[in-house]
C-alpha cells in the first residue's frame, strides 16, 4: 500500500505550478455548465481574483524567509541540533518530528509549518539512517490539525462580534460563537488528539526497514550555511561600524517586541500571521551577530520563496472562479454547497459539510476563501436542520485542513526549505490522508449524535 501510493504520486503528480494550472482549467470547465457561465464570464472572474491574495502572498513569503533566516542564527542552530540528537533511532525521529510539528501547528499554523521542517532537517543532519522524504512528509503532516487549533481562521472569525458575522452568514449567526463551542470543545480536542496519534503511528510504521532514501548530512549543512563569517579586520568607516552595530538590531527588535506586548497583552488581540512574522523578525535581528549578517541570511533565504510568489496569484484566480457569480446568480461554490445540503440530515450534515469543504479546498486552499464560499449557505442550512453552529464551523475547518495533505499549495514553504519536490512527500501524505479521514469522519458523526 505504501509503495503503491508513493509510486502513484511520483508518476502522476506534476510540479506544483503545473498542478495549479490544471486546477484552473478544471474549475473553469466545471463552472461553465454548472453555473451557466460563458467563457468570457469565467475569464473575468479568474482575472478579477488573480491579485486578491497579494497581501497574503507577501505574508507567506515572509513567514518562510524570516523563519529560515532565524534558523540560520548560530544560537538557534545549536539549540535545534541539540534537540535533534534526542531520538536514538529512525522511527523515533519520525515520531518526534510528527508530534512537534502537529503541536506547533495547533498553536499557530505559520509557526508550526516552518519550525517542523527546520527541525526535520536538523534531525537529518544528525541521523544518516532516516528516510529524508518521509521525515519532511512527517513534518508537513502535522499541518492537518491547524484549523482545529487556536490560530484557526474560521472559528476565530465566528468568535468575533460585529455585524460582519451576520452579513457573512446571511443572518444565520447574529451572536458570536465562543471558542468553547469550537476549538476548545471536548469533541474537537479529542479529534485533534486521535489525529496526532494516528499520523504519528502511521508515519513511524511507514519508515522502511531497508532501502531508506537518505541524504548526505554534509549537503544539508552546506545548504543551511546562511551565516557568513564576520570580518576579523578592524572596521574603519562609519558605514562599516553601522553594519556591525548590534545596538541597531536590538533597537528595532525591541520596537517589534513592544508592539507585540501592547497588541497581544494589553489589548488582548489574537496572535495572527503578522504577529508570527514579527516574532521571527525580532528574534532573527537579536540572535544574529550583526545587522549585516541578518541581511545576508535573509537574502539567501529569499530564493526559497519563488514558488509562493509565482503560484499564489493562480490560486487567487481559481478562488475567483469558485466564488464568481454570473448572470445566473449562482457560483460554483454555491452549487457544491447546495448539492451537499439536499442529501443531508441533522446527523450527516456535518460530515457532508466536511467533505464539501475538503473538495473545495483543492481549488480554494484558504480558510478565508472557505468562509466566503460556504458561510452564507452552510450556516443557514445548518440552522434549518438545528445543527450546532459550532459543529458546522468546525466541519468546514476540518475539511479545509484535511485535503491540505495532498494539496501542494501549503507544502510550498516546507518544500522550499527542504529542497524537495511535492511528489517526494505526497505519497506518504496520501496514506495520512486516508487514516485521518476515517478519524475525522467518525469524530464528526459522534459529535453530531
Describe each region flagged by the PLM.
Residues 1-5, 38-46, 71-87, 122-132, ...:
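Flexible loop linkers connecting adjacent transmembrane helices
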Residues 1-65, 184-197, 201-311, 431-434, ...:
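Hydrophobic transmembrane alpha-helices of multi-pass small-molecule transporters
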Residues 18-21, 57, 94-96, 136, ...:
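Hydrophobic alpha-helical transmembrane segments
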Residues 32, 56, 60, 68-73, ...:
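Transmembrane alpha-helical segments of multi-pass membrane transport proteins and ion-pumping complexes
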Residues 53-164, 363:
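Early transmembrane hairpin of solute transport permeases
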Residues 86-119, 309-326, 337-380, 384-385:
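Hydrophobic alpha-helical transmembrane segments of multi-pass integral membrane proteins
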Residues 90-105, 129-153, 157, 170-180, ...:
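Alpha-helical transmembrane segments of multi-pass membrane proteins
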Residues 119-214, 410-443:
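Membrane-core helix-loop-helix motifs of multi-pass transport proteins
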Amino acid at each position: 500500500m505504501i509503495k503503491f501510493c508513493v509510486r502513484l504520486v511520483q508518476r502522476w503528480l506534476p510540479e506544483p505550478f503545473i498542478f495549479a494550472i490544471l486546477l484552473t482549467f478544471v474549475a473553469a470547465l466545471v463552472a461553465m455548465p454548472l453555473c451557466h457561465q460563458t467563457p468570457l464570464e469565467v475569464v473575468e472572474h479568474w482575472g478579477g481574483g488573480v491579485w486578491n491574495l497579494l497581501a497574503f502572498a507577501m505574508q507567506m513569503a515572509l513567514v518562510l524567509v524570516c523563519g529560515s533566516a532565524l534558523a540560520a542564527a548560530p544560537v538557534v542552530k545549536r539549540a535545534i541540533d541539540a534537540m535533534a540528537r534526542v531520538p536514538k533511532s529512525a522511527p523515533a525521529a519520525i515520531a518526534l518530528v510528527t508530534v512537534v510539528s502537529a503541536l506547533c501547528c495547533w498553536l499557530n499554523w505559520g509557526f508550526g509549518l516552518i519550525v517542523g521542517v527546520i527541525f526535520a532537517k536538523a534531525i537529518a543532519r544528525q541521523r544518516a539512517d532516516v528516510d529524508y522524504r518521509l521525515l519532511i512528509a512527517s513534518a508537513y503532516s502535522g499541518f492537518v490539525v491547524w484549523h482545529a487549533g487556536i490560530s484557526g481562521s474560521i472559528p476565530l472569525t465566528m468568535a468575533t462580534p460585529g455585524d460582519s458575522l451576520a452579513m457573512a452568514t446571511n443572518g444565520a449567526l447574529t451572536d458570536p460563537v465562543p471558542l468553547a463551542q469550537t476549538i476548545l470543545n471536548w469533541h474537537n480536542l479529542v479529534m485533534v488528539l486521535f489525529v496526532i496519534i494516528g499520523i504519528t503511528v502511521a508515519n513511524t510504521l511507514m519508515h522502511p526497514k531497508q532501502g531508506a532514501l537518505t541524504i548526505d548530512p554534509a549537503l544539508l549543512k552546506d545548504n543551511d550555511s546562511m551565516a557568513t563569517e564576520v570580518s576579523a579586520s578592524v572596521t574603519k568607516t562609519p558605514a562599516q561600524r553601522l553594519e556591525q552595530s548590534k545596538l541597531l538590531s536590538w533597537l528595532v527588535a525591541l520596537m517589534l517586541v513592544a508592539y507585540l506586548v501592547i497588541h497581544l497583552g494589553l489589548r488582548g488581540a489574537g496572535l495572527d500571521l503578522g504577529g508570527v512574522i514579527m516574532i521571527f523578525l525580532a528574534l532573527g535581528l537579536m540572535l544574529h551577530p550583526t545587522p549585516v549578517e541578518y541581511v545576508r541570511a535573509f537574502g539567501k533565504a529569499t530564493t526559497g520563496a519563488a514558488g509562493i510568489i509565482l503560484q499564489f496569484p493562480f490560486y487567487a484566480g481559481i478562488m475567483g472562479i469558485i466564488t464568481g457569480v454570473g448572470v445566473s446568480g449562482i457560483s460554483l461554490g454555491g452549487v457544491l454547497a447546495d448539492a451537499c445540503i439536499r442529501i443531508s440530515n441533522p446527523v450527516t450534515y456535518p460530515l457532508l459539510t466536511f467533505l464539501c469543504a475538503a473538495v473545495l479546498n483543492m481549488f480554494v486552499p484558504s480558510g478565508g476563501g472557505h468562509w466566503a464560499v460556504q458561510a452564507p449557505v452552510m450556516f443557514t442550512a445548518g440552522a434549518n436542520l438545528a445543527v450546532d453552529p459550532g459543529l458546522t464551523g468546525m466541519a468546514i475547518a476540518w475539511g479545509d485542513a484535511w485535503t491540505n495533505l495532498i494539496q501542494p499549495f501549503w507544502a510550498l514553504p516546507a518544500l522550499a526549505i527542504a529542497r524537495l519536490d511535492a511528489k517526494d512527500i505526497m505519497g506518504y501524505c496520501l496514506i495520512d490522508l486516508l487514516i485521518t479521514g476515517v478519524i475525522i469522519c467518525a469524530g464528526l458523526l459522534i459529535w453530531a449524535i
